[in-house]
Amino acid sequence: MEKAPPGAILLLMLFAHSCAVALNATNDPGADEFHVGVILDLGSLVGKEARTSISMAVEDFYASHKNYRTRLVLHVRDSRGNNFQAASAALDLLNNYNVKAIIGPQKSSEAFFMTDIANITLDLLNNYNVKAIIGPQKSSEAFFMTDIANISEVPVISFTTTSPSLTSDNNPYFLRATINDSTQVNSIASLIKYYGWREVVPIYIDTDYGRSIIPDLLEALQGNDARVPYQSIIPQSATSEQITQELYKLMTMQTRVFIVHMTSPMASVLFTKAKEVGMMDKGYVWIVTFGVASLIGSLNPSVLEAMNGALGVGVYVPKSTELDNFTVRWNTRFRMDNPNDPLLKLSIFGLWGYDTIWAVAQAVEKAKSTKDTVQIQHMTNSMTSLKVPKETENGLKFLNAILQYKFRGLSGYFDLSGRQLQPSTFQIINIVGKGWRDVGFWTAQDGFSQRLTRPRSNGTYLSTKPDLNPVIWPGESTNIPRGWEIPTSGKKLQVGVCTSDGYPEYIYAEKDPLIVGMTKASGLAIEVFEETVKRLPYALPYEYVFYNTTENISSSYDDFVYQVYLKASKTL
């Protein structure tokens, strides 16, 4: 294959797809071509959506900038969603320790990945002399790609990798054209505090994506006086039966407020099973994080039905005529790209992909506005016998051009100067029927609001009064759940009761004649006690134990209290 000119650029968008077609954005023979590698997982919702969006972005950009002397050319590849962690370790061994053999890997998918994906990636880097990589979709893929970027010194740009554990601190060529998952934790914790819930159970997938948000989430919840008595960790390979067993376990606990942080496929199984076991009934609270909330419109209708009553935290996308027009065109294009698939709803990931291409194309033109002197070194990779180009000048120049470019795109204010997008506004949604409705908005500056007014110059929005719209909770209830219930098992607090000789209106107790072992109690003291228990921020199961002080003249109230003391002493 003939190599592209030294000024070429590869934007490797790691999402996964099996296509090796170059999408040329121009017919101008005089334009400098910058080759962009696109690796997508088109078996996923986001991957399919992204391919359509980025293709349209290239076409739209150069239709609006016909005088530009640079052009991006996309080269689509397929990673098939394989595990990039094994490949990252293999490349580290091959490059840093010059090993001649690798034992394993353990999984066949890892082996296929090492031979397929590594070759695809390094082939693109070698043959097209790339200067940037866009992607990947998964955090595990991103770790692998940042290793490649560190070898070749090219930027990695991902608009879907939200894991907080992947930062630019140790990966200077990594840019996150999406949010960091940790940016949503304060909005979630504020939501818990707003409704007065005191205990929360996170349910998350046992991967880097699932685990990495937890420390920041726990800190935010603690700062809002909410306890986390238990964490439900779902293995990535969990079966439906295992998920059902975990749900039954949660039902035995008093907490009824759950925060779900996992991939949309696993969340679909979780909520389907939760519906089956009765955990989507009245009294339960479910909150899904950004990863699931952003894809609500593309989930199966049966899953949406199971999720009815849940809340979601997403990133607000400002409405605009440009967005409306693009959505219409995108729907038509998506049907053409995927004639055998049901129509997906365009999500913020597709918009970020579109805006990322515009940012890259603009940066390419800016970086090439002056004549470059390109110095390229090569590092041989033992596994593939391919050479990885190492940029020492233009990679940094291109990176700086991206960092300096700010604009208002389809997704809103697009600014990577901090090496990742900073969401200005989070949107709280309530899943109802076959869709969702707005509950309100949250900003770090103003907290909650029902509506947003005019935007500020920095992309943030002015909010209205600090309140939220009504919610239809699980079980079609409009009453705010208290967040806890008496557990189905466990010890109960035994409350001794007796009858007052002269004042039965103060306290009266007797054994229930219909139920063996049951004690009936009434009176002012009982009413005060039961009302106090109701106001506790947690469940306190209890039962009355009758103590007769009237039948035995030698017994007295003092004896009754002393018996309580003796029982406590024996317990100690």
Per-range role (PLM):
Residues 1-520, 524-547, 554, 558-567:
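Extracytosolic ligand-binding ectodomains
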